[in-house]
From Swiss-Prot:
Key words of the record: Activator, DNA damage, DNA repair, DNA replication, DNA-binding, Nucleus, Phosphoprotein, Transcription, Transcription regulation
UniProt protein name: ARS-binding factor 1
Phosphoserine modifications at: S402
Disulfide bond sites: none
Family affiliation: Belongs to the ABF1 family.
Annotated source species: Kluyveromyces marxianus
One GO biological process term: DNA replication
Keyword DNA repair: yes
Annotated InterPro entries: BAF1_ABF1 (IPR006774)
Superkingdom, natural source: Eukaryota
Bias (Acidic residues) ranges: 128-143
Any one Gene Ontology cellular component term annotated for this protein: nucleus
Length: 496
């Protein structure tokens, strides 16, 4: 970052160092004497220097109007503070510009017209840059304007009394991060000084205060354009900063009027915060009445807040009642849905019972057919065996094995029929259990369901199958008894 030091015989690095001849820092007998120096510096460089802060009228910090610029000066009081009015409130030093400005009129005019080396050379280049800046927004220096308004108001509040010194610069950083050529034009520099002129020279707030007292605490009759023409602000600017009639064109007058409007708006806002703006004078008798008005305003605000709070509670109660009604309606709808679903499930249960009856009947018929087929086959074979009376060992063995296979196949068919019937019934029962109905709603249907009849039929079929197996075992044992072992056959018959 490039840094620039503007040439000045006083504002430089040596200002914070001891004078080799006198052996001490350069001092200023009053704060007004210091403002003579700093105002001349900012006028020549077209760079506004603002008062950043002050501490108990003993320490003052000045800085460049650009926030990013490192330029800074710390001015400190070197002895006991002596103020003519005894007021040691902060910001007194700014008010001393009032006396200085009258002294500075001819002084600044002298610099503007007769300093050809430093000021005019850089001023021309600054004017060239200003022609380009004219196309930009006129509010680029709003920060400087705001700071100037605050400083000027503080100056008026603390009157014109001079703070006696001595004062000395204890710290200085005289370098800027912007070249002299890029600084403000003379017109734009003057615009940054309008708030100070309004407050210090023209006592702008006092004028508005008087107008409020005469017009029921309003400034509605105040006309900015008329004030700019008749207040004398144009003459002050011309004399103090050397502007010509050509430089005071319409655009310049419009910008001055905008600054006046800004300061007027600040005053109105302050009165509104105090609660007295637009309040008739008959109601503003004393400070106690003003306090009472503020209390009434606060009470009205609290009452309005309570009313809003009650309205909010009523809205919440109404919303809750609507919600409960909505929930009740939902419950009725839900109960209707349950009853309709129960009716549908009742019909489904009857259908499932009919299906189970049909499946059980089919299974029983299949099992009975299988048993009947087996009995017929057994009777036919017994008749055939009795009629033929075959005594040969090979034929008897074949008949015995064929009977076993026949019994086994019949038993398998019956068992398979029972398994199929059982599987179908279980599948239908699963479907029945999957129906999404209440248990209590279907208990009556299950009591009247013919599942018990189906179970009874299956038990009968199972017991009948066991009897058949028992008969097969008895027949097998009888056949085994009829068989004669080889060792029991007489030897003389073995060869036959």
């Amino acid at each position: 970052m490039s840094l620039y030091e503007y040439n000045d015989p006083i504002i430089n690095k040596d200002l914070a160092q001891a004078d080799p001849v006198m052996g001490q820092n350069r001092t200023f007998p009053t704060l007004e004497a210091w403002y003579d120096v700093i105002n001349d510096y900012e006028f020549q460089s077209r760079c506004p220097i603002i008062l950043k802060n002050s501490h108990k009228t003993k320490h003052f910090t000045f800085a460049c109007h650009l926030k990013s610029c490192p330029f800074k000066i710390l001015l400190s009081h070197q002895g006991p503070v002596s103020v003519q009015n005894g007021d040691g409130s902060p910001g007194v030093g700014v008010g001393d510009e009032h006396g200085h400005h009258h002294h500075h009129n001819m002084h600044a005019h002298h610099h503007h017209h007769h300093q050809n080396g430093h000021t005019n050379g850089h001023g021309n280049s600054g004017d060239d840059v200003s022609e380009q800046e004219a196309q930009q927004d006129d509010e680029d220096d709003d920060a400087a304007v705001t700071a100037a308004i605050a400083a000027a108001v503080a100056a008026v509040a603390d009157s014109q009394e001079t703070i006696k010194g001595p004062f000395a610069v204890t710290k200085i950083e005289p370098y800027h991060n912007h070249p002299l050529e890029s600084n403000l034009s003379l017109q734009r520099f003057v615009l940054t000084k309008i708030p100070k002129i309004l407050q210090v020279d023209l006592k702008f707030d006092a004028i508005l205060e008087s107008l409020c007292n005469d017009e029921d605490n309003t400034v509605a009759k105040f006309r900015v354009a008329q004030y700019v023409e008749e207040s004398g602000i144009i003459d002050i600017i011309k004399q103090r900063y050397g502007l010509t009639d050509a430089e005071m064109d319409k655009k310049m007058l419009s910008n001055i009027a905008r600054r006046v409007t800004t300061d007027k708006a600040r005053f109105v806002l302050k009165r509104k915060k105090e609660g007295v703006y637009m309040l008739p004078n008959g109601h503003q008798i004393s400070g106690a009445d003003q306090h009472q008005h503020q209390l009434q305003h606060q009470h009205q605000h609290q009452h309005q807040h309570q009313h809003q709070h009650q309205h909010q509670h009523q809205s919440q109660d109404q919303h809750q009642n609507q919600h409960q009604q909505h929930v009740g309606n939902d419950n009725h709808v839900y109960q209707d849905r349950i009853h309709s679903q129960s009716d549908q499930d009742e019909a489904g249960v009857h259908n499932l019972d009919d299906n189970n009856v049909r499946v059980a009947a089919a299974a029983a018929a299949a099992a009975a057919a299988a048993l009947q087929s087996r009995d017929s086959h057994v009777s036919e074979e017994l008749k055939l065996n009795c009629g033929t009376g075959q005594d040969e060992d090979g034929i008897e063995d074949d008949n015995h094995s064929s009977k076993r296979q026949l019994h086994r196949s019949d038993r398998d068919r019956v068992a398979e029929a029972l398994k199929m019937a059982t599987r179908d019934i279980l599948s239908n029962q699963n479907v029945d259990s999957d129906v999404n109905v209440d248990v209590d709603l279907v208990t009556g249907h299950k009591q009247l369901s013919p599942h018990d009849d189906m179970a009874e039929q299956l038990r009968l079929l199972s017991s009948h199958l066991k009897e058949v197996e028992a008969e097969e075992n008895v027949s097998d044992s009888n056949l085994k008894k009829d068989d004669v072992q080889d060792e029991n056959i007489q030897p003389e018959l073995r060869g036959q």
